[in-house]
Amino acid sequence: MKRDLQGHYVTISTVGEAAQAFVPEPLPPNPSLDWMPDLRSKFDQALLALGRLDSISTFLPDISLFLYMYVRKEAVLSSMIEGTQSSLSDLLLFELDMEPGVPLDDVREVSNYVAALDYGLKRLAEGFPLSLRLIKEMHGVLLYKGRGSNQTPGEFRRTQNWIGGTRPGNAAFVPPPAARVLECMGKLELFLHDQPQPTPALLKAALAHVQFETIHPFLDGNGRLGRLLITLLLCEQKMLREPMLYLSLYFKSHRQYYYELLNGVRLSGNWEAWLDFFAEAVIVTATQAVDTARQLIDLANEDRDRISDLGRAAASTLRVHRALLERPITASGWLVKKTGITPATVNKCLRHLERLGVLRELTSRRRNRVFSYTGILEIMNRGTELPG
């Protein structure tokens, strides 16, 4: 399929020099997509993988336990793409009001990502549409406090931004002028609402992600919010009952190719190459998520079996174990509140779990000690390793 530039350039003057800013054509692509057999087959496979992922809730004993960790893993990965150095353990320690091992602003960025997703899903559940208003509200949550809090959170940019380089004149890409942002985002909102015509949900998510990245409507947080919108849109369109598809690890692993594909769409209209990549990302990510869920179930069952052999101590230790599935890094004080067991008994249970190799203490103090469920963290940490 031969297409030309998917938009047009306008000359802008900013930071004392002229530059060419790109204004994209509205969606859907024109001419229409070329659904070659290979691409159609890849998208069909992606839809099947998405269906298997959505069925996780039928075999997970408690989907909320899986989501708690999975959402936080995504927050770490999505923020890592933007340069933060927070690990999953750092985030969980931060949520316990403990000192993480990296700069506080890094962990706060990751924590804000979790909060922004939670906020968006809550608004959708209340019947609020996926709209420019909701996108801006989520952006306000994403940039609350920490780095980026001075970058007009919750508001479309009023000044020019650019991607790569030190100024627009040597940038890799210059998004639309600030005066055109509302117009471009308004057209994207129409597309999200199936105007001028309906678009299947997975295809809509793939196309909208590129368009959002191209418009780059905010001064900061565009990448994180653009990845968040994929999951949010699939939930709104009822493709997923729970927010379980996160593509950041795949995008991170193929980062250079990802950026090349975005530019390929803008410069030559090669939407098909992007869609092939996006479908592969969905297949790989959804399959990995199902495998991760099964590993977590197997781990919990194996540990329960070992705890059951403790004899009289088994009943209370199983209650503590159940609570630890919910919070794999937690303090003994929280376990007392969660289980309703006395502090002395909780501490005995923790000693049993340490002896079994289920837990590892992260502190060396007498009160409100902090423990890590090592097996869960080993499973969830795969792919989140910080660069050495």
Question: Where are the regions a protein language model picked out?
Answer:
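FIC/Doc superfamily catalytic core
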Residues: M1-G388
